[in-house]
Amino acid sequence: DEVKNIVGAFYQPKMVFIDPETLHTLPRRHYINGLMEALKAGLIYDASLFALFEHGDIEKDLDTIIEKALYVKKSVVEQDEREQGLRKILNFGHTIGHAIESYYHLSEYLHGECVALGMLYFIEDEQLKQRVISVYERLGIPTHVDFDPEAVYQLLCRDKKADGDHVTIVHVPKAGTAELIETPLDEVRTILKGTQA
């Protein structure tokens, strides 16, 4: 069964090796796909990182984007190694994103594309959402995909983040900030049925 994120574990790396030059060996779609995690980091924690996507030159700013995204993850994980609270903000876009990815059998859309779609559901400020959509369009990230909302909901219920009849959803009220909101799964079902990203 092609389902994402049903188990997890915590292991810290012994070292991290970063070679931005290897990214240039990727097809453009995969290169941009990988940058969606950095865009997410900007939306949840560092508005200046989001600004690089919105106003900067991604090729020219790549080293800065990587450095800022790593700082976000390092800072968050150091404060909450076992995902008891703050670290959950790193899941922004992933709850619905993993379900969309599973719906398409982990093949038609890439992980970063699905996370990007998942983020759109919980950006509260409509102007910010439009700014994010503009970034997606410029980079070639899908802003909408067709799916059966009930099937995606059922996949979401199998995610390890779902707890009984609730799931912790990451909301972004403004660039650089995130809030964790315990949300009834039925409310997520309504969101999926009422509006697709």
Feature map (PLM): residue ranges:
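Active-site segments that bind and position negatively charged phosphate/pyrophosphate groups
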Residues: 51-151
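C-terminal charged capping/lid subdomain of soluble metabolic enzymes
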Residues: 36, 130-197
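Solvent-exposed alpha-helices and their adjacent loops that cap or buttress functional pockets
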Residues: 7-11, 81-82, 161-163
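Short helix-capping/linker segments at secondary-structure and domain boundaries
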Residues: 43-50, 104-107, 125-131, 164, ...
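Residue-level marker of motif borders
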Residues: 14, 89, 168-169
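A glycine/threonine-rich phosphate-anchoring loop and its flanking beta-alpha core
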Residues: 1-54
